[in-house]
Swiss-Prot record:
Protein name: Acyl carrier protein
Species this chain originates from: Pseudomonas putida (strain W619)
Organismal lineage: Bacteria, Pseudomonadati, Pseudomonadota, Gammaproteobacteria, Pseudomonadales
UniProt record similarity statement: Belongs to the acyl carrier protein (ACP) family.
Domain Carrier residue range list: 2-77
InterPro entries recorded: ACP (IPR003231), ACP-like_sf (IPR036736), PP-bd_ACP (IPR009081), Ppantetheine_attach_site (IPR006162)
Known role: Carrier of the growing fatty acid chain in fatty acid biosynthesis.
Chief place of localization: cytoplasm
Length: 78
């Protein structure tokens, strides 16, 4: 099974239409990977589905980088 980091990066690449090797931990979804507000909503929804969790809106607003997404999932698993 893939690590959480690998799974998050795969989802980000698929949702934003970028290559997986462009998705590094420090990248901002908006500033570096070209996401708009709709992309970020869809990204959060994809993360919720993949990791079978619910991300409240106030938390979703804080998930602006690849690392923030990884950290959120890590802290809300199991």
């Amino acid at each position: 099974m893939s690590t959480i980091e690998e799974r998050v990066k795969k989802i980000v690449a698929e949702q934003l239409g970028v290559k997986e090797d462009e998705v590094t931990n420090e990248k901002s979804f908006v500033d570096d990977l070209g996401a708009d507000s709709l992309d970020t909503v869809e990204l959060v929804m994809a993360l919720e589905e993949e990791f079978e969790t619910e991300i409240p809106d106030e938390e979703a607003e804080k998930i602006t980088t690849v690392q923030a997404a990884i950290d959120y999932v890590n802290s809300h698993q199991g």
